[in-house]
Amino acid sequence: MPWIQMKMNTSGAQAEELGDALIENGAVSVTFQDTHDNPVFEPLPGETRLWGDTDVIGLFDAETDMADVIAGLEHHPLLGSGFHHKIEQIEDKDWEREWMTNFHPMRFGQRLWICPSWRDVPDPNAVNVMLDPGLAFGTGTHPTTALCLTWLDGLDLAGKTIIDFGCGSGILAIAALKLGAAAAIGIDIDPQAIQASRDNAERNGVSDRLSLYLPHQQPDNLIADVVVANILAGPLRELAPLISVLPKRGGHLGLSGVLASQASGVCEAYADLFELDAVAEKEEWCRITGVRR
């Protein structure tokens, strides 16, 4: 079934109000899109940030009388008669199949593959993590996840303990376990991430070696051979006193979720306790690694 799309441009301050107006006039969904394709990073908790120049896009059933919709919107105080808009028809697709075709097995480093369950494993003798996109962030497609996976693949993890701080889907902890780590601990503030990590660990046969905690549940005096935190620059700086003491002396630390432009500030927060390596970059993102002094 085809759909009808209406697009309007406005300021970020007015976008949500116009989105509500579209819903009130029959839109089945509303999305916000930056007119200039600039991302928004690290909104504060409880804050909905939109761009200064925002496209508000409403999706309508194909049978909708758009003349009635336009007439209804013209009464809105932000619009008025003759407001600027664009209407086009969009053909329907098999969105589930379309979505699935975008995910392929991906290789990281020399040994590690991340494979969606509906794809054949390219190399049965490699280290294969079976992982489908789901509730929690982390499938290997984002540059920060890729940087962390490549780093883990290059470490000797045999018999080691790893902490995945901000575990999301559990991809990093699970990859470490399949690369030879003896045990892993995943910590996340989101209960859905804890559940996603648990489900993914079971699917990969490593659930008996993965312990998962919300922050208030984690044991005191946690310590590990390897600590990885793929979160964001702000939390990495703020939580540096907590994260810095998780690796044992001589242990490895890997940090990502950091824009290359933010690297120096994050490095400064960890420089006292770690011998830091050169920053690794991928696209506009980076990874910071080091060894605990």
UniProtKB/Swiss-Prot annotation:
One of its GO terms (molecular function) is protein-lysine N-methyltransferase activity. It catalyses: L-lysyl-[protein] + 3 S-adenosyl-L-methionine = N(6),N(6),N(6)-trimethyl-L-lysyl-[protein] + 3 S-adenosyl-L-homocysteine + 3 H(+). It is an enzyme of class 2 (transferase). This is Ribosomal protein L11 methyltransferase. Keywords: Cytoplasm, Methyltransferase, S-adenosyl-L-methionine, Transferase. Gene3D superfamilies: Vaccinia Virus protein VP39. S-adenosyl-L-methionine binds at residues 145, 166, 188, 230. Belongs to the methyltransferase superfamily. PrmA family. InterPro entries: Ribosomal_L11_MeTrfase_PrmA (IPR050078), Ribosomal_PrmA_MeTrfase (IPR004498), SAM-dependent_MTases_sf (IPR029063). HAMAP family: Methyltr_PrmA (MF_00735). Its main location: cytoplasm. Methylates ribosomal protein L11. One of its GO terms (cellular component) is cytosol. SUPFAM superfamilies: S-adenosyl-L-methionine-dependent methyltransferases (SSF53335). CDD domains: AdoMet_MTases. It is found in: Cytoplasm. It comes from Erwinia tasmaniensis (strain DSM 17950 / CFBP 7177 / CIP 109463 / NCPPB 4357 / Et1/99). Its EC number is 2.1.1.-.
